[in-house]
Amino acid sequence: MRMEAGEAAPPAGAGGRAAGGWGKWVRLNVGGTVFLTTRQTLCREQKSFLSRLCQGEELQSDRDETGAYLIDRDPTYFGPILNFLRHGKLVLDKDMAEEGVLEEAEFYNIGPLIRIIKDRMEEKDYTVTQVPPKHVYRVLQCQEEELTQMVSTMSDGWRFEQLVNIGSSYNYGSEDQAEFLCVVSKELHSTPNGLSSESSRKTKSTEEQLEEQQQQEEEVEEVEVEQVQVEADAQEKAQSSQDPANLFSLPPLPPPPLPAGGSRPHPLRPEAELAVRASPRPLARPQSCHPCCYKPEAPGCEAPDHLQGLGVPI
């Protein structure tokens, strides 16, 4: 309650400590204007500056000659704050700025009031910056007998705007068919991206179709690449099997089995025998003109058949 001149006021000591405890009424001198309220109202928000002010002597504050607490703030915005603590609603005059009330609410640390004012300011900003609605217009040409049916069947947000009589273009016998131009409109609901909901849905569906088509093309390309790779591998294998140069690259044959009664033959023996068999016989020495000088030293010691006639001494 704001104290006005000529009004009856509680005793001067109502703002201070009375005998036996604190008084019920509290005076607040805000910027030269005295407000009178109850201690219960000020203690509505436990974490606020006003609640701490009237709960004890922890928060030191000066007082005037009447015992009212001195608060150096603007009294213009203190009235809505005090009313909010009384009934929990924010009531502002038309000429009162919400920014000023918000500044005072932050000073007094009244959390619920701060949130309410910020929400209201955001709503106003959104309303101011909101894009005005846009309309799409269509002009339909119809005959008189079709006009009633067309207007009655309009739906999906289309609205009749104007009807223009353009006379008759055709003459069938004695009766003329009057024709009209019917102007209809539809509101486009804007989205945060600046597109209407209908156009955004169409754009989205088109993008999805393009993505699906691109995915299908990529899958087809992968399958074709795999088929070409398989065909190339098969062709390469066929060519390598027909090339005689690749015969040497065949895997080695397994070793022959062990003989029935012994160990495995030495690997070099077959080659040695083959070399001996394949080696040419020694050339016969030319026959000397001298008679054979072979003379057996003892009877019965004759030269072998392949050495007879060669003149080789024994």
Curated annotation (Swiss-Prot):
GO CC entries: Cul3-RING ubiquitin ligase complex; cytoplasm; endoplasmic reticulum
Q: Which domain of life is it from?
A: Eukaryota
List the residue ranges forming a coiled coil, or say none.
196-239
The alphabetical list of record keywords is: Cilium biogenesis/degradation, Coiled coil, Cytoplasm, Disease variant, Dystonia, Ubl conjugation pathway
Name of the protein described by the UniProt record? BTB/POZ domain-containing protein KCTD17
- Which pathological condition is tied to this protein? Dystonia 26, myoclonic: A form of dystonia, a disorder defined by the presence of sustained involuntary muscle contraction, often leading to abnormal postures. DYT26 is an autosomal dominant, progressive disorder characterized by a combination of non-epileptic myoclonic jerks and dystonia. Affected individuals manifest myoclonic jerks in the upper limbs during the first or second decade of life, and later develop dystonia with predominant involvement of the craniocervical regions and sometimes the trunk and/or lower limbs.
Task: Report the record's Gene Ontology biological process terms.
Answer: cell projection organization; endoplasmic reticulum calcium ion homeostasis; positive regulation of cilium assembly; proteasome-mediated ubiquitin-dependent protein catabolic process; protein homooligomerization
Query: Acidic residues bias located where?
Result: 208-225
Regarding tissue, the record states: Highly expressed in brain. Highest expression is observed in the putamen and the thalamus.
User: How is this protein organized at the quaternary level?
Assistant: Homopentamer; forms a closed pentamer. Interacts with CUL3; interaction is direct and forms a 5:5 heterodecamer. Interacts with TCHP. Interacts with CUL3, as part of the BCR(KCTD17) E3 ubiquitin ligase complex, at least composed of CUL3, KCTD17 and RBX1.
Q: Which SMART domains does this UniProt record tie to the protein?
A: BTB
Taxonomic lineage from the root: Eukaryota, Metazoa, Chordata, Craniata, Vertebrata
